[in-house]
Amino acid sequence: MKVFIDPPNSLILFDLVERFGHEPLSSMAAIQNKIDNVEVDMPPMNLTLEDVIKGLKYAGVEVPSGVRGRLSLWGPMIEEADAAIIMLDPPFNFGCVGCERSNEMVKYLIKRRGIPSISVNYPNNEEEAKATVGQIKEFLEGLK
C-alpha cells in the first residue's frame, strides 16, 4: 500500500513504512521527479505553469505562495495514498514542519480523503520512541 508520511520529508517515517513492506510517499521522490524534468531550467528554483495550477487546486489564490507550492507537491501524493502517518508536534528540525498553514491543510486533506491514518506524538525520550514505533508498526501491519 502507498502510505503518505507527514512531515513528508521524514527519513525516519520513510524507513519505517518501507521496513513494513509498504511504499512511502514522500517529498524526496516528488522533488527528484521535478529535478529530473527537462522543463525546469534551474531546478529547484523554477516552477512550471502546471505546478501553479496544481497548487491552486488545494489552496486559493489568497493563500501564501509557499503554502500553494508545498501543496502542489504534497496534494497529489495525498490523493494517491492508501493510508497516512502523521507525526504531531515535532520539533522544527524534524522534516519540514515550519509552515503551520501547510501542516493544517495536509491534515485536512488526509481527513477529507477518509483513508486510514494514524497520528502519533513526537517522542521525547527512549520509552516514548519505542511506544511510537510500536504504534506505527501495529498500524502498518494492519494495512496488509
How would you name each of these model-derived features?
Residues M1-K144:
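An N-terminal assembly and electron-transfer interface module characteristic of large anaerobic redox
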